[in-house]
A protein has these predicted regions:
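PLP-dependent amino-acid enzyme catalytic core
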Residues: 1-113
Length: 113
């Protein structure tokens, strides 16, 4: 997604990357989505798997909300400082429609099997 947005053209990956954020796992972003992103997205960054898990854990422990990993990807740059926004109001939509609480990593829920 980031490669295509930066290049301004569809970038196809040979393999689908492994990630906990399965809602974002794709070989490429289509032409229409890329056009919308190029028009409205100001900047884009990536986050590591560990940062996704840390964000999931934070939201669960502090807000008592289970969000899907793809949703955590949108919030993680604020926690890591990749999107610095001191003193600014920032809106992030958190969703949980694509999550199976029984398959969340143990480090998020604190469950021991």
């Amino acid at each position: 997604m980031t490669r295509g947005w930066r290049a301004g053209t569809v970038q196809r990956l040979e393999e689908v990357p492994a990630t906990i954020a399965d809602g974002l796992r794709t070989r490429f972003v289509g032409e229409r989505n890329l056009a919308v992103m190029r028009q409205y997205v100001y900047d884009m960054t990536t986050v590591a798997e560990e940062e996704i898990v840390a964000t999931l854990r934070f939201v669960w422990q502090r807000l008592k909300i289970i969000i899907e990993p793809s949703s955590a990807v949108a919030l993680a740059p604020l926690f890591t400082g990749r999107y610095p926004a001191p003193g600014r109001r920032v809106g992030v939509i958190l969703s949980g429609g694509n999550v199976d609480p029984f398959h969340l990593p143990e480090e998020i829920t604190g469950a021991h099997g």
